[in-house]
Amino acid sequence: MSDSRLVKISKYLSKYLRHTPDAIGIKLAPGGWVAVDELITACAKNKFPITRQELEAVVESSEKQRFSFDSTGTLIRANQGHSVEVDLQLEPVVPPDELYHGTGHKSVDSIMETGLCKMSRHHVHLSKDIATAQTVGARHGKPVVFAISAAAMHQAGYIFYCSDNGVWLVDRVPPEYLQKI
């Protein structure tokens, strides 16, 4: 698919996911989300057909990360720049080269096998320094700290957030980006 097609789709999505969703018959849910299937149907009805693959390409190729999918891949939103009322709460940010995760020693084998998963939370929580990760890990017994290759994950398309209190958030950390320290 051509770069010009991706730019055209990106501009179209910007207009309707940021400014005038009602003009194509979509309603943004809290956080600015809309169902991918609903968006694809609305675009087709408005004579601008888009495929799921094109949406994925726009999301993945956008250097400014204008759009993101939720963790299930069933919802999409514009990350910023809205003129309609949307409380996004978090905006994607570029992480430092390394982040850290503290846990108890009982979880190490599982983490090494499957990576870090969000479990019942919305995101995996990461620390910017080893000391904080050790403190977090100590809540679960003898602490173990993992270094996360955050820059490499980001380059691979993983989206990071930083909360107001400095906790770094990501949907998951695959084992290939982890190193026990």
Curated annotation (Swiss-Prot):
Pfam families: PTS_2-RNA
Classification via InterPro entries: Ptrans_KptA/Tpt1, RNA_2'-PTrans_C, RNA_2'-PTrans_KptA, RNA_2'-PTrans_N
Gene3D superfamilies in alphabetical order: 3.20.170.30, RNA 2'-phosphotransferase, Tpt1/KptA family, N-terminal domain (1.10.10.970)
EC number(s) from the headed UniProt entry: 2.7.1.-
SUPFAM superfamilies linked: ADP-ribosylation (SSF56399)
Keyword Zinc-finger: no
GO molecular function, one term: NAD+ poly-ADP-ribosyltransferase activity
Leader sequence segment: none
Any one GO biological process: tRNA splicing, via endonucleolytic cleavage and ligation
Keywords, in A-Z order: NAD, Transferase
Function: Removes the 2'-phosphate from RNA via an intermediate in which the phosphate is ADP-ribosylated by NAD followed by a presumed transesterification to release the RNA and generate ADP-ribose 1''-2''-cyclic phosphate (APPR>P). May function as an ADP-ribosylase.
NCBIfam families: PRK00819.1-4
Similarity comment: Belongs to the KptA/TPT1 family.
Protein name as annotated: Probable RNA 2'-phosphotransferase
Organism this protein belongs to: Nostoc punctiforme (strain ATCC 29133 / PCC 73102)
Lineage: Bacteria, Bacillati, Cyanobacteriota, Cyanophyceae, Nostocales
Gene: kptA
